[in-house]
């Protein structure tokens, strides 16, 4: 588990939410609860994207702060590993004279 810092700004149009120490993790919601839920989802999406690209996750920085934030709080990133196996028929496997499709 990695613990980052979330910040929220209460605006007339809703709540702006951002993970201060994970660049690009930004969203907004109509309410604080919606913004929290969407920010948690955005954090997972950003982390998975980094990993799929072979990029490291940013290190949490507890010293990150935004003086304009109305609320700052920890946000926890929990990732799980998954395996995916694809069965390729022998005649279609590369090198066996058949055609191969990875779709």
Question: What are the functions of these language-model segments?
Answer:
Residues 23-34:
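A short, exposed loop/beta-hairpin motif centered on an aromatic-Gly-Thr core
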Residues 4, 15, 25-27:
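Structural detector for hydrophobic anchor residues on beta-strands
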Residues 20-23, 103:
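Short, proline-centered helix/strand-breaking motifs
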Residues 1-3, 37-103:
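Short, charged, surface-exposed hinge/linker loops at domain edges
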Residues 7-21:
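Short aromatic-glycine-(Arg/Gly/Cys) micro-motifs in beta-strand/loop hairpins
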């Amino acid at each position: 588990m990695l613990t980052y810092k979330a910040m929220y700004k209460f605006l007339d149009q809703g709540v702006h939410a951002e993970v201060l120490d994970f660049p690009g993790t930004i969203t907004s919601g109509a309410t604080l609860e919606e913004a929290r839920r969407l920010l948690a989802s955005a954090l997972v999406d950003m982390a998975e994207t980094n990993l799929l690209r072979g990029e490291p996750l940013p290190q949490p920085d507890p010293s990150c702060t935004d003086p304009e934030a109305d609320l700052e709080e920890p946000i926890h990133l929990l990732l799980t590993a998954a395996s995916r196996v694809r069965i390729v028929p022998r005649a279609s496997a590369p090198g066996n004279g058949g055609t191969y499709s990875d779709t």
